[in-house]
Amino acid sequence: MTEEKLVERVTALFADSDAAQRKMIRLYAETNDAIEASAIIDSGAAVLHMLQGGLRPEVLVLDSVLSDTTIFPLLRSIRQQQIEYEPHIIVTLMPSAAPQIEKILTLVAECTIFKPYSLP
């Protein structure tokens, strides 16, 4: 009798302005059965456009500094959108941004992850 491994896939939208980070995320998502990257993008405008266009990832993983915005205006815009579901939001940031964590968490983010980080 063979043992089947059941893996629940999580759909996630990733936004990071660093091309190397996006490449690493793409590779990780391609090799990990638990992650389905619905989008890997570099700007807040692209995040908003995709959400307004009907993309419904379960999780948003957002860098605190994107190519066109910082996390605060982006979180406010996401919060103001009339979307019928609430994705889980994770924000990645540099340790120097630690004083901003409380503000980030009050603007709908559920978790923060400090960079640099490593993927298993």
Name every feature range the model reports, one short phrase each.
Residues E8-Q21, I25-A29, L60-V61:
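Conserved acidic segment of CheY-like receiver
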Residues I40-V59:
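Acidic, metal-coordinating helix/loop segments flanking the phosphotransfer/catalytic sites
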Residues S43, T70-P73:
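Acidic catalytic/metal-coordinating carboxylates
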Residues L60, Y85-A98, A109:
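A short, hydrophobic beta-strand element within the central beta-sheet of small alpha/beta folds
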Residues F72-P73, P95-T112:
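Alpha4 helix (beta4-alpha4-beta5 surface) of REC/receiver domains from two-component response regulators
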Residues F72-Y85:
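Short amphipathic alpha-helix used as the core "switch/output" element in two-component signaling
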Residues K115:
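A Lys-centered signature of the CheY-like receiver
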Residues S118:
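Receiver (REC) domain switch/active-site region of two-component response regulators
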